[in-house]
Amino acid sequence: MITTPKFRNINGSSFHQELKRRVNNYFIENNKPQTGNFSLYFKAVLFWIAYIALYIHVVFFTPGTWWSISECLLMGGLTAAIGFNVMHDGGHGSFSNSKFWNKIAAYSVNALGASGLMWSNKHNIVHHTYTNIDGIDDDIEIKPMLRMCPTQKKYFIHRFQHVYVWFLYTLLLIVWVFASDYTKYFKKKVGIVPLKKLSAFDHFAFWTAKIGYYFMMIALPIYMVAFVSWLVGFLVLTMFAGLILSVVFQLAHTVEETAFPTPMENNDIENEWAIHQIQTTANFATRNKLICWLVGGLNFQIEHHLFPKISHIHYPAISKIIKKTCDEFNIKYIEYRHMRDAVVSHTLHLKRMGTI
């Protein structure tokens, strides 16, 4: 039976302590809050207005076929963008200094079909603690179709996983909305990690959000535009969103240079938690302002994993501090200059996992 490991820092590194001191000093010296600002709130409102406007136009005004497909593609992109920029920061409590608005931002994902509650358990508690640890980190548990790390069992089909993976990635949101949320809900755990005890309100919110989504995204559109038109539009939206979400999240951890640490015999991880995060995480395209704006700073994954409660709008600034500290402590800082470089590395990693 797999149990959750402990981070022991057997080398006695002071890296994390020193890094926290330097980053905290940056905010104190510059008199800046660690949460979001007007630019983030403007982006959140912009994305939601665009999404709602497109939904109304597609469902109630029934534009032509190709126009509708184009708008569904845009809605798929906006679904991912809202997840990256609004829900993600809100879920980590970094969207605002107000707990109320952080809750609103975090649970906005419910309107997009996913459960904010299940996401919080899967992402904040499991993934951010046990990153890239096989058998615990749910983000690399895509068995048996994909072999993401060397300790997972290999099948013949994995020889081709670097080819068919892109189709599987398009299914992420569909599986998330219709299957994985329910698996976690009824099993009351994420992998081997138990869910936090759900309150009566949590149960009510889970089912209300699911029913509301099914009505708004399935029942009402079918009534308005007929089944076939709805099916095409729904698949275009969800598959495009799934592809974007999958690629951005996988480029952060499953590339050639990231590690997949295995606990020692006593079930300890030899490094302190912060060093573990850097060894298992990679950045990409950090100089590309458009990508950074669209993906909510998730191309700065090292910064995010080290300081998840700091809003992504601050990642470019604190990345300089983190790089410098990594250099001083001789810790490799993994970064791909362009997004295409990270995509190639991810593809080569999957190809290697299918052959070794």
Label the model's feature ranges.
Residues 249-273:
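C-terminal, non-catalytic macromolecule-binding modules
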Residues 35-83, 110-111, 160-174, 197-248:
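Alpha-helical bilayer-embedded segments of polytopic membrane proteins, i.e.
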Residues 62, 90-95, 184-187, 224, ...:
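Membrane-interfacial segments
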Residues 4-6, 32-39, 90, 105-110, ...:
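Glycine- and acidic
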Residues 20, 24-42:
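Membrane-interface, cytosolic juxtamembrane amphipathic helix immediately N-terminal to a transmembrane helix
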Residues 74-198, 265-354:
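Membrane-embedded catalytic scaffold of the fatty acid hydroxylase/desaturase
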Residues 2-25, 171-186:
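Short, charged cytosolic
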Residues 237-250, 254-255, 322-332:
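C-terminal, active-site-flanking charged/polar segments
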